C-alpha cells in the first residue's frame, strides 16, 4: 500500500467494553474513540469507522459530532441478509425505547439510506409488530403506524418477525431493544445454518460427493450469511458519517465498512437526510408520551 495515504494518530487511553459510555467519553479524552470523534468534528476527516464500545461510540457521536438539526435520536442501521438480498434494520440497538416520533424518523432515514446508498428505488418500509391488525401493538407502535401513513415514503404497514428474513421489505423499523434481538438472533441463525450444512454434507462419502456437486450454491449461501460482506452499521442522524463495525471484524469487514462510509459521503447521505427530516416534520402532527422527552 501507499504509506503516504495513511496517517497514524497516537492515542494513549483505551475505552473497554465494560466502561460506562458517558463517563468514558468525557474522561478518556486520549482514547482512540474520543480522538477519532474529535478529529471528525474538527473536519480532520470525512467519516469515522470504529469497532469499539458501541455505547461509547453512540454517546460520543451524539455529544461531539452532534445530531442533524431536527433529528431526535440517532439510530444504528445494520444491513442484514434476506432471501431476496438484504434489508436495513433501524434501530439495531441505539435506543432501548423509541417513541412514535423516533420510529417515524428512523423510517425516513432508513428509506433515504437504501435509496441513496443501496440504489433501491422507492424502498419498501415496514414497522415491526406482533400482528398485522391495525389495533395490535404498543401505543408507540400504533401511533407510529399512523404517522408513517402521512409521509411520502413507501410505507407498507406492519411486518411480523417471520416475514423479516423473507425480504418482504427493504427497511425494517423498530425500537432498539427489538432490533438488537433481531440482529443477534439472525447472526446466531447464520452460524447454526452453516454448522447444520457442514454436518449434513460431511457425514459420509456420498454426502461429500453431493457437496462437491452443489459447492457453488453452498459458497453463495455462506457469503450471503457472512456479516463481513455487509460492512458496518451506520449511525444514522449524525452530522457526519459514523459507522459501527462489528466487534469481531476482520480485514474484509473493515474494508466493506470503509467503502460503505465513503459511499455515504459521495452520495451526500447526511445532506439528504437533513433536507427530508425537516421537510417531513412540517407535514404531520406528533403526539408523544412525556416519558420519552
Regions found by a protein language model. Give the residues of each.
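Glycine-rich phosphate/diphosphate-binding loop of Rossmann-like nucleotide-binding domains
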Residues: 96-161
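Short, conserved active-site loop motifs that form the nucleotide-linked donor/cofactor pocket
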Residues: 6, 87, 153
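Phosphate/nucleotide-donor binding subsite
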Residues: 3-45
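Glycine-rich phosphate-binding loop
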Residues: 39-58, 136, 141-147, 151-220
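Single conserved hydrophobic/aromatic residue that forms the stacking wall/gate
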Residues: 284-293
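Glycine-rich phosphate/nucleotide-binding loop
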Residues: 65-75, 81-89, 171-172, 176-280
Amino acid at each position: 500500500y501507499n504509506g503516504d495515504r495513511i496517517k497514524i494518530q497516537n492515542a494513549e487511553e483505551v475505552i473497554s467494553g465494560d466502561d460506562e459510555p458517558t463517563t468514558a467519553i468525557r474522561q478518556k479524552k486520549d482514547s482512540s474513540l474520543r480522538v477519532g470523534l474529535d478529529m471528525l468534528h474538527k473536519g480532520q476527516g470525512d467519516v469515522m469507522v470504529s469497532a469499539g464500545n458501541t455505547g461509547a461510540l453512540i454517546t460520543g457521536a451524539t455529544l461531539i459530532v452532534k445530531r442533524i438539526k431536527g433529528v431526535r435520536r440517532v439510530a444504528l442501521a445494520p444491513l442484514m441478509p434476506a432471501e431476496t438480498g438484504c434489508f436495513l434494520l433501524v434501530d439495531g440497538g441505539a435506543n432501548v425505547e423509541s417513541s412514535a416520533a423516533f420510529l417515524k424518523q428512523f423510517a425516513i432515514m432508513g428509506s433515504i439510506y437504501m435509496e441513496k446508498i443501496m440504489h433501491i428505488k422507492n424502498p419498501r418500509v415496514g414497522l415491526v409488530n406482533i400482528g398485522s391488525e391495525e389495533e395490535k401493538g404498543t401505543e408507540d407502535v400504533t401511533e407510529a403506524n399512523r404517522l408513517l401513513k402521512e409521509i411520502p415514503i413507501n410505507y407498507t404497514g406492519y411486518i411480523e418477525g417471520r416475514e423479516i428474513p423473507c425480504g418482504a421489505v427493504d427497511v425494517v423499523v423498530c425500537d432498539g431493544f427489538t432490533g438488537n434481538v433481531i440482529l443477534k438472533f439472525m447472526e446466531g441463525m447464520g452460524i447454526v445454518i452453516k454448522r447444520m450444512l457442514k454436518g449434513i454434507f460431511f457425514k459420509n462419502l456420498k454426502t461429500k460427493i453431493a457437496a462437491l456437486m452443489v459447492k457453488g450454491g453452498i459458497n453463495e449461501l455462506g457469503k450471503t450469511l457472512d456479516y463481513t460482506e455487509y460492512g458496518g452499521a451506520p449511525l444514522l442522524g449524525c452530522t457526519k458519517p459514523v459507522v459501527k463495525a462489528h466487534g469481531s471484524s476482520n480485514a474484509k469487514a473493515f474494508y466493506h465498512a470503509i467503502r460503505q462510509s465513503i459511499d455515504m459521503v459521495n452520495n451526500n447521505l447526511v445532506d439528504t437526510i437533513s433536507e427530508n427530516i425537516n421537510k417531513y416534520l412540517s407535514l404531520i402532527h406528533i403526539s408523544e408520551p412525556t416519558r420519552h422527552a
